[in-house]
Amino acid sequence: MIENIKKDAQERMGKCVDATKNQMAKVRTGRAHPSLLDSIQVSYYGTMTPLNQVANVGVEDSRTLSVTVFDRSAIQAVEKAIMSSDLGLNPMSAGATLRIPLPALTEERRKDFIKVVRNEAENGRIAIRNVRRDAISEVKKLEKAKACTEDDVRRSEEEVQKFTDAHIKKIDEILAAKEIELMEV
């Protein structure tokens, strides 16, 4: 029973780390990366469709993305969706392909992005600590129900704390790497 609680806590903590990593990946660095446009929705024949379902996103060079639209009639809808996104990008049309030059980040903008990334990391840490709290309270419920001993509770609390420390360390490593990436000129 306690093993299931610990296993579940470890899985949930892993998911928290993955979610934090995905949130941080959305923060724009100076480099072009196809995942930068993952959050963009295109109005395609009256329905909102993810950009990656109506176009192929690729990297042309370190500062330029290329978007090849599958259906030529949707080029303007894709262009409009990219321009109206909060990424501050201006696509240039070249036939069935849109070229998106990424403007260089200013020092002030980089610092803003670092604040956003640190906030995401803190949210990830909080989520992991919430998982720890839930796991420990589940184990204590078992103790109250006389399903395990006090020693088992203490041992499992220590193990859950080790999982927590390891996962928070992973988030800190991801944060440090992202900060370095953001400060590169």
UniProtKB/Swiss-Prot annotation:
Tell me the compartments it is located in.
Answer: Cytoplasm
One of its GO biological process terms is: cytoplasmic translational termination
Q: What Gene3D superfamilies does its record include? A: 3.30.1360.40, Ribosome-recycling factor (1.10.132.20)
The record's section on SUPFAM superfamilies has: Ribosome recycling factor, RRF
Coarse class of the primary localization is: cytoplasm
Classification via InterPro entries: Ribosome_recyc_fac, Ribosome_recyc_fac_dom, RRF_sf
Q: Which GO terms describe its molecular function?
A: ribosomal large subunit binding
Per the record, GO CC terms? cytosol
Q: Does the keyword Cytoplasm apply?
A: yes
Going by the UniProt record, its keywords in alphabetical order are:
Cytoplasm, Protein biosynthesis
Pfam families the record matches: RRF (PF01765)
What does the UniProt record say this protein does? Responsible for the release of ribosomes from messenger RNA at the termination of protein biosynthesis. May increase the efficiency of translation by recycling ribosomes from one round of translation to another.
- Which family is this protein grouped under? Belongs to the RRF family.
The cross-references to HAMAP family, in alphabetical order and at most eight, read: RRF
UniProt-recorded name of the protein: Ribosome-recycling factor
In its UniProt entry, the species of origin is given as Shewanella baltica (strain OS155 / ATCC BAA-1091)
